Amino acid sequence: MRRNAKGGSTMKVFLNAGHAPDGNPDPGACGYGLRECDVAKNVADLVAGYLTAAGVEVVGCLQSDSLREVVSASNRADADVFISVHCNACNGSANGTETWHYYGSTEGEKLAQCIQNQIADALGTVDRGVKGAKPGVNGLYVLSNTDAVAVLVELAFIDHAGDAELLRSQQDEFARAIACGVTDYEGAC
């Protein structure tokens, strides 16, 4: 029987695809004909399928422009793990994958490292590392207000030519890597 971070029998995961549904009013970062909201939604939906197939309970997969709504939904679902999927951007001058966790959360850091390792290994992206978000400095709302062990995955840079091609053609591989990272975490990475 599977054990989860809260000691229950099945790990419960809540997925959040970054930015507004259909890009209205905020599509997130854009580049090379891609919109962050679309890539994030596609990848999150694929992750949900892979996790379900692996016996992990997906208790939500929400895309909303309201971060409060996202956090409330995750907390109401009593999720053990919260994963927010995004794409990064930096005027085409950076590339790679990074995964954020709430600063000081050892479980969040462990989950982030499991996912980061899987993505970098599977897709060969530049490993920009695992980063801790500090409230008042670079605290990401979903990480600091979610009860679950929480991470925010920046898949790759949507405005970098090479990364954008991966985001366009390898969404399934990104999703598999995230799902593998979750199951690695469940097994203590």
Each PLM stretch: what is its role?
Residues 14, 20, 25, 82-87, ...:
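Active-site-adjacent mobile loop/cap segments within catalytic or ligand-binding domains
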Residues 10-11, 51-57, 77-82, 122-126, ...:
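Loop/turn elements at helix/coil->beta-strand transitions in domains of secreted/extracellular proteins
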Residues 42, 46, 52, 109-124, ...:
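Long, well-ordered alpha-helical scaffolding segments within enzyme catalytic domains
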Residues 2-71:
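Active-site histidine-acidic residue metal-binding/catalytic motifs
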Residues 28-31, 73-75, 96-99, 145-146, ...:
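Short, glycine/charged-enriched secondary-structure capping and boundary segments
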Residues 71-87:
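A short, hydrophobic beta-strand-centered structural micro-motif
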Residues 58-64, 125-133:
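Surface-exposed patches in mature extracellular/periplasmic domains of secreted proteins
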Residues 22-35, 89-122:
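A short, glycine/acidic-enriched catalytic loop
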